[in-house]
Amino acid sequence: MAENMFLFWGSGSIPCWKPMIVLEEKGFGGYKNKLITFSNKEQKGEDILKLNPRGQVPTFKDGDIVVNESNAICEYLECTYTDKGTQLIPTDKAKRARVLQRMHEAAANMQQKLVLDLLYYFIQTKEEDRKEDEVAKKVEAAKEELGRWEACLGETKAFVAGPDFSMADVWFYPFIAQSVRMGLDLGKFPNMNAYYDKVTARRSVQKSWPPHWKEEPPIISPFKGRI
């Protein structure tokens, strides 16, 4: 099956990393792939545009089936190959509801408060133009969001939706890993710290770890000394 799959992806992209974790969890580690370089705008190349008119990655093929959008790829893989590898969305109604809730909580809130509001502010705003009161508001919102997940992990004592690794973790963990890379001090969040160590050690995460993270320091560290 994996030999019929193909993924276009970029290193360090959370949208790319999520389906890569799913592919490993489902036992499809041998899938074909192409690592693109964002700085050269390779996502706008003809080979991707003919599959994804938006010129974005991840772009995924399973035989003749093309699936674009990170979350759609994750859900496609789980729904199509439910019986393969790790079951990431439970069949039990109560457990499924919990996982689905946490999936979409992470996708909406972690993306907005840690990435779009805080990280992108530092990327898109020159240092001399940054306003400390604006930074303080964004930092406070990020802290509040992280506090919610710290409490959640205090309740579950394991993963974000319960005792088992699930799609909720696939959608949540990369935001934490990226934030740690950019200076987040997990010493202030003991439950999240234990969670981070546990998930980081998973084979699926190690196999899909962004390669340039192993070789290059982050360009900016907006979380360092702030959270």
Predicted regions and their residues:
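GST-like domain detector, emphasizing the conserved glutathione-binding G-site
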Residues: 1-136, 140, 226-227
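Short, solvent-exposed turn/loop segments enriched in Gly/Ser/Thr/Pro and often Arg
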Residues: 10, 167, 212-215
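Glycine-rich, flexible loop/turn motifs
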Residues: 34, 44-47, 56, 84-85, ...
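Positions that flank functional sites
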Residues: 38-39, 194, 214
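Active-site-flanking alpha-helical
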Residues: 78, 175-176, 209
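Short, hydrophobic secondary-structure boundary micro-motifs
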Residues: 85-91, 113-116, 158-163, 206-211
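GST-like fold's C-terminal all-alpha helical module
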Residues: 102, 106-201
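Acidic/histidine-enriched, glycine/proline-rich intrinsically disordered or flexible terminal extensions
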Residues: 212-227
